[in-house]
């Protein structure tokens, strides 16, 4: 028997949920062979699921959180393919912001770009990015700022973090973009849906 259960946001990881199911199965049949595997939909738990299933390693890096505070973000590297596995939720996730502070006008994806930058520095050129669980609505502007893009107001200054910066955006520049980005490929991971 294989248990593969997605996380329960803010209360139980995928592995904890799978282990709880395995314990329930063993109460009914102590001899049952149960294998617990992580599962994720692109949000919380994506790094754990993919790194575990692909024999990767976990990395930790301090980045700018959704409210510009320092946070420690965990991501994975699959060394055999120089692939980084990143969760937007780890650097810009809704669980990093208290209920009282949740305001997409003020939250940024800058930390996601910092994670990408760290992985590039470690030799990664392929990226699997889970975009679920975000506390942001800046269109990825913060992430791109961290990678060297300029998002400028009418006076030539960087726009403020968060969706509020989009209102004053006048110009986008690529003068300081990391040159390594030309050799990078991305795949975004989201919950699959079926439209009927």
Regions found by a protein language model. Name each.
Residues 1-2, 33, 58-59, 82-86, ...:
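Structural motif
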Residues 1-51:
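N-terminal phosphate-binding or glycine-rich loops at protein starts, especially the Walker A/P-loop
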Residues 40-43, 67, 189:
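Glycine-rich beta-alpha junction loops
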Residues 47-55, 75-78:
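Glycine-rich loop at the start of a catalytic domain that most often binds anionic cofactors/ligands
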Residues 51-69:
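Short, structured active-site "lid" loops
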Residues 70-136:
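Anion-binding (especially nucleotide phosphate/pyrophosphate-binding) glycine-rich loop
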Residues 106-110, 114-130, 135-182:
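Glycine/threonine-rich beta-strand-loop-alpha-helix active-site module
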Residues 187-193:
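Conserved small/polar residues in nucleotide/adenosyl-binding loops
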């Amino acid at each position: 028997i294989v248990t593969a259960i997605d996380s329960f946001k803010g209360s139980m990881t995928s592995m904890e949920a799978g282990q709880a199911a395995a314990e329930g199965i063993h109460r009914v049949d102590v001899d049952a062979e149960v294998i617990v595997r992580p599962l994720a939909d692109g949000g919380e738990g994506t790094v754990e699921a993919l790194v575990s299933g692909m024999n990767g390693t976990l990395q930790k890096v301090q980045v700018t959180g959704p409210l510009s505070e320092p946070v420690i973000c965990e991501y994975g590297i699959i060394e055999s393919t120089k692939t980084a596995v990143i969760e937007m939720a780890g650097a810009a996730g809704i669980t990093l912001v208290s209920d009282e502070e949740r305001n997409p006008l003020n939250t940024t994806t800058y930390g996601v770009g910092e994670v990408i930058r760290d992985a590039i520095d470690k030799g990664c050129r392929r990226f699997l990015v889970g975009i679920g669980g975000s506390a942001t609505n800046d269109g990825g502007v913060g992430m791109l700022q961290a990678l060297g893009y300029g998002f400028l107001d009418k006076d030539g200054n960087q726009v403020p973090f968060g969706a509020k910066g989009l209102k004053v955006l006048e110009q986008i520049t690529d003068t300081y973009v990391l040159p390594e980005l030309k050799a990078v490929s991305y795949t975004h991971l989201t919950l699959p849906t079926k439209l009927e």
